[in-house]
Amino acid sequence: MAVLSLLLLGGLWSAVGASNMAVVTCGSVVKLLNTRHNVRLHSHDVRYGSGSGQQSVTGVTSVDDSNSYWRIRGKTATVCERGTPIKCGQPIRLTHINTGRNLHSHHFTSPLSGNQEVSAFGEEGEGDYLDDWTVLCNGPYWVRDGEVRFKHSSTDVLLSVTGEQYGRPISGQKEVHGMAQPSQNNYWKAMEGIFMKPSELLRAEVHHAEL
């Protein structure tokens, strides 16, 4: 009976809720904008010259850069089915499309600000538990027009940009790092990309949560 009710609600969601309930889902490939500094989360096959020596993660102003796409996945050692809405408080991984490495953090110092280093780690989408980030947002689900924070699940820092700028060979790109303190520097928003639609049943659950 409960399943039938959800399926019936699915039709209502399609008619009423589709325009204002654009949830972000597993399997989506997106660019993430830091709303304070207007840069998109970016990576490339350039390694840090200090700290971990892993692949660097930066912020770029370019809207068109192909190195700014990230796939949203379930946390380490789990599978999040494509089209599953991301809940506020849910741990996820963000996998860099062009290099196959995951957004990662650990107790190394970032090169410019002295905060916690954020890197890209792993091979072909598989790294370790330090790739997990918890989505912090208002309401039951991460929605496309809403701002979110990403809290590193193991060290509790927030994915942040505070404006420090690199020189060569990545001139003009901003440092991305982890900070313990919540501030306007920690807010991100899903922008361009390919957003996987929820299944009918999952869309029904989203609508039911909003009633």
Curated annotation (Swiss-Prot):
PROSITE patterns hit by this protein: MIR
Signal sequence region: 1-18
Q: Does the keyword Heme apply?
A: no
Instruction: Kindly state the tissue distribution recorded for this protein.
Output: Ubiquitously expressed with highest expression in liver and kidney.
Listed under GO biological process in this entry are:
chaperone cofactor-dependent protein refolding
Q: Where in the cell is it found?
A: Secreted
State the CDD domains in the record: beta-trefoil_MIR_SDF2_meta
Task: Please provide, in alphabetical order, the Gene Ontology terms of the cellular component aspect for this entry.
Answer: endoplasmic reticulum; extracellular region; protein folding chaperone complex
> Which coarse location class describes where this protein primarily resides?
secreted
Taking every annotated instance into account, which residue ranges of this chain make up the domain MIR? 21-75, 83-138, 139-193
Provide the GO MF annotations for this entry.
misfolded protein binding
One Pfam family per UniProt: MIR
Keywords of this entry: Repeat, Secreted, Signal
InterPro entries for the chain: MIR_dom_sf (IPR036300), MIR_motif (IPR016093)
The protein depicted here goes by the name: Stromal cell-derived factor 2
